[in-house]
């Protein structure tokens, strides 16, 4: 194949795109999918999902995006997000919206727990854990990287070791 152009990169630094391994850009991407502040720094991939993801909604998790901080630019996503009953639905919505960076995500442990028991502070029951295992398996099938808990924040902090191990056993099958 013939070279079409030669670019002089003398005195320049050439590198692949950077990966933000703990991105909190879910809301900023809803406001402006170009994510200019990250792209101009060379960040081309964002990994999300620490403790929370906007999907799936269902079961005891009523969903609902918080619009108080971002206001109107996020409100246009509120109705749409009510239908995100699978983890893949919000990733597909970002893709359809044409967000600039590559996106990868864990299922937020708090979101997972809310699907089974909302903000209940009690240990999970067998039935609730079965719900969490099912939702976790669906998320893995939908492309989740795994599960991520932030054990200092509710409802993640209410999960005991046995519950977390139970969920991680599902992740381990994928």
Please place each PLM-identified region on the residue numbering.
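Short, well-ordered coil/turn elements that cap or connect secondary structure elements
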Residues: 1, 98-100, 173
């Amino acid at each position: 194949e013939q070279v079409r152009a030669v670019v002089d990169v003398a005195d320049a630094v050439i590198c692949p795109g950077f990966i933000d391994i703990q991105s909190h850009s879910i809301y900023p991407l809803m406001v402006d999918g170009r994510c200019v502040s990250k792209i101009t720094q060379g960040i081309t991939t964002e990994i999300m999902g620490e403790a929370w993801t906007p999907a799936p909604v269902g079961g005891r998790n009523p969903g609902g995006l918080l619009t108080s901080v971002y206001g109107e630019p996020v409100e246009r996503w509120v109705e749409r997000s009510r239908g995100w009953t699978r983890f893949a639905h919000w990733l597909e919505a970002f893709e359809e919206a044409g967000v600039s960076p590559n996106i990868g995500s864990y299922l937020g442990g708090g979101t997972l727990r809310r699907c089974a028991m909302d903000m209940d502070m009690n240990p999970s029951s067998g039935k609730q854990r079965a719900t969490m295992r099912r939702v976790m398996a669906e998320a893995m099938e939908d492309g989740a990287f795994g599960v991520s808990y932030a054990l200092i924040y509710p409802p993640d902090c209410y999960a005991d070791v046995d519950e977390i191990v139970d969920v991680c056993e599902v992740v381990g099958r994928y």
